């Protein structure tokens, strides 16, 4: 089983979610019990909804617990360097269009494209890993190969200060 990188902050967020889900569990069980007491389960929408919620809740708890055993927790405040790696914020330029994009490389369980972070397992991140400023990378995309240049590499850590 390989380890999955995650930041300390990302790990804490999942711990909070797991705790919240476990606290929600008794309420869902109670809702099932109450719906069951209403009688005929074949036409009991409340029962069906509560059972569905229980299934989703238990699946998410199981998923988080199994992932936590695989995590390699990395403190973003302790990493720096001149090569792209987990935790780096990387600016790249599309060599054809000139468009610039900036991504922070995080683990798959905390990446959020809308917030500018991508998984280190994504095709773009995999092409960048180990590269330096000025290096050219090629990403296989649905529209074909895209050539980028790495413009800058920064390590901001959790305090937002560049190292």
Curated annotation (Swiss-Prot):
Gene3D superfamilies found in the cross-reference section: Transcription elongation factor, GreA/GreB, C-terminal domain, Transcription elongation factor, GreA/GreB, N-terminal domain
SUPFAM superfamilies referenced in this protein's UniProt entry, alphabetically: FKBP-like, GreA transcript cleavage protein, N-terminal domain
Entry coiled-coil feature ranges: 11-38
Any single Pfam family the record assigns to this protein: GreA_GreB_N
Annotated keywords: Coiled coil, DNA-binding, Transcription, Transcription regulation
GO aspect biological process, one term: DNA-templated transcription elongation
GO molecular function, one term: RNA polymerase binding
InterPro entries named in the record: GreA/GreB_C_sf, TF_GreA/GreB_CS, Tscrpt_elong_fac_GreA, Tscrpt_elong_fac_GreA/B, Tscrpt_elong_fac_GreA/B_C, Tscrpt_elong_fac_GreA/B_fam, Tscrpt_elong_fac_GreA/B_N, Tscrpt_elong_fac_GreA/B_N_sf
Family classification: Belongs to the GreA/GreB family.
PANTHER family, alphabetized: TRANSCRIPTION ELONGATION FACTOR GREA (PTHR30437:SF4)
NCBIfam families in alphabetical order: greA, PRK00226.1-2, PRK00226.1-4, PRK00226.1-5
Function: Necessary for efficient RNA polymerase transcription elongation past template-encoded arresting sites. The arresting sites in DNA have the property of trapping a certain fraction of elongating RNA polymerases that pass through, resulting in locked ternary complexes. Cleavage of the nascent transcript by cleavage factors such as GreA or GreB allows the resumption of elongation from the new 3'terminus. GreA releases sequences of 2 to 3 nucleotides.
Listed name of the protein: Transcription elongation factor GreA
Organism: Nitratidesulfovibrio vulgaris (strain ATCC 29579 / DSM 644 / CCUG 34227 / NCIMB 8303 / VKM B-1760 / Hildenborough) (Desulfovibrio vulgaris)
Organism placement in taxonomy: Bacteria, Pseudomonadati, Thermodesulfobacteriota, Desulfovibrionia, Desulfovibrionales
């Amino acid at each position: 089983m390989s380890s999955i990188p995650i930041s300390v902050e990302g790990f804490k967020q999942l711990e909070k979610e797991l705790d919240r889900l476990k606290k929600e569990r008794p309420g869902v069980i109670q809702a099932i019990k109450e719906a069951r007491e209403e009688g005929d389960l074949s036409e009991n929408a409340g029962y069906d909804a509560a059972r569905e919620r229980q299934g989703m809740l238990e699946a998410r708890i199981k998923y988080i617990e199994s992932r936590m055993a695989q995590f390699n927790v990395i403190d973003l405040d302790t990493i720096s360097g001149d090569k792209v790696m987990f935790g780096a914020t990387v600016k790249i330029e599309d060599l054809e269009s000139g468009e610039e994009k900036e991504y922070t490389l995080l683990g798959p369980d905390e990446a959020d494209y809308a917030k500018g972070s991508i998984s280190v397992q994504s095709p773009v991140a995999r092409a960048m890993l180990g590269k330096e400023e000025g290096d050219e990378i090629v990403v296989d995309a649905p529209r074909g190969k895209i050539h980028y240049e790495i413009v800058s590499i920064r390590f901001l850590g959790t305090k937002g200060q560049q190292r």
